[in-house]
Regions:
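A short, exposed loop/beta-hairpin motif centered on an aromatic-Gly-Thr core
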Residues: 17-31
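Hydrophobic alpha-helical targeting segments used for export or membrane insertion
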Residues: 2-14
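Short, intrinsically disordered, charge-biased short linear motifs at domain edges
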Residues: 1-3, 17-21, 47-53
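Short, well-ordered alpha-helical segments
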Residues: 28-31, 35-40
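Short, mixed-charge low-complexity intrinsically disordered segments
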Residues: 38, 42-69
């Protein structure tokens, strides 16, 4: 079974989230979860410490099964 990585950036301050982002299809749950963890770290670095602290930003991800794959 394949899994699609879905990521989202949210603000704990406002309670709002940006639209979900497709992080690609992965062959196993492990691959999807590992990619989600790494992509979360990369997204936080890209957002920057100042913006993350100011807006109380955080990144979430989930791995959804790909139907019919």
């Amino acid at each position: 079974m394949k899994f699609v990585l879905i990521m989202k950036i949210c603000s704990a301050l406002s309670g709002n989230c940006l639209p979900e982002h497709n992080g690609g299809v992965h062959n196993t749950w492990y691959d999807c979860a590992a990619a989600g963890s790494l992509n979360t770290l990369n997204a936080m670095a890209e957002l920057g410490r100042e913006d993350v602290n100011k807006r109380k930003l955080f990144v979430t991800f989930k791995c959804d099964p790909v139907i019919g794959a």
